[in-house]
A protein has these predicted regions:
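N-terminal beta1-alpha1 cap of cysteine-dependent amidohydrolase-like domains
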Residues: 1-47, 159-181
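Short coil/turn connectors at secondary-structure junctions
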Residues: 13-14, 47-49, 71-74, 103-106, ...
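Structural motif
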Residues: 16-20, 52, 152
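Cysteine-nucleophile active-site neighborhood
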Residues: 23-99
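Short, acidic Gly/Pro/Ser/Thr-rich loop/turn segments
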Residues: 24-26, 86, 115-118, 156-160
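A residue-level structural signature of the nucleotidyltransferase/glycosyltransferase Rossmann-like core
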Residues: 50-51, 108, 141, 150
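Pocket-forming structural segment of enzyme catalytic cores
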Residues: 66-141
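A glycine-centered loop/beta-turn motif at secondary-structure junctions
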Residues: 135-171
């Protein structure tokens, strides 16, 4: 099921939410519309809903995103991250991370200009072995909060990381079973 601009988000209708990204103009449009879905999305996340958010989706789940022209776009603050975007170089290339919680290695391809910083109580999706990750400073990539899996892996995260895809599907299935019990 797709949710378009100006449509409501009903948390009960979804087992897994996929939230992708876009260019700055599109993110500006989505950021404004997302404020109307904010409470329902936060409820879904806090009720252990499963979310996979890539790049712009990751950024807009956070507190704010500063685009390339310096405009600050409010996120929905579902996760404690912020993204700054005033940088001369993009972070591009293959990336490898290790998720110590699950004992898994994830592979991907990153291509982003924003630099994302995790709040003190946020866990990364993994520690960077190769590549840049969220920024060039703290050597972590993505964010994992409850059943929310955020990443800058464009290339394609679930296809290249079957164990992560299986974990996400099983988490959603278990959540559905517990709701129906």
């Amino acid at each position: 099921t797709l949710i378009s601009l100006e449509e409501d988000f009903n948390p009960e209708d979804f087992d897994i939410v996929m939230f992708g990204g876009g260019q700055d103009y599109e993110q500006t449009v989505v950021a404004k519309d997302l404020q109307n879905k904010k409470d329902a999305l936060i409820q879904y996340i806090e009720d252990n809903g499963v979310v996979v958010a890539i790049c712009g989706g990751f950024q807009l789940l956070g507190r704010y995103y500063v685009n390339a022209s310096g405009e600050r776009l409010n996120g929905i603050s579902a996760i404690d991250v912020c993204t700054n975007g005033q940088f001369p170089n993009r972070l591009i290339g293959d990336v490898e991370i290790v998720n110590e919680e699950f004992g898994e290695t994830y592979l991907g391809y990153e291509n982003h200009i924003g630099r994302t910083y995790l709040g003190k109580n946020m866990k990364p999706l993994g520690k960077v072995v190769k590549g840049f990750g969220n920024n060039e400073e703290d050597h972590v990539e993505g964010c994992h909060y409850k059943n929310v899996f955020c990443s800058y892996f464009h290339g394609p995260i679930l296809v290249r990381n079957q164990h992560l895809a299986d974990r996400i599907i099983e988490t959603a299935a278990e959540r559905q079973r517990s709701k129906n019990a």
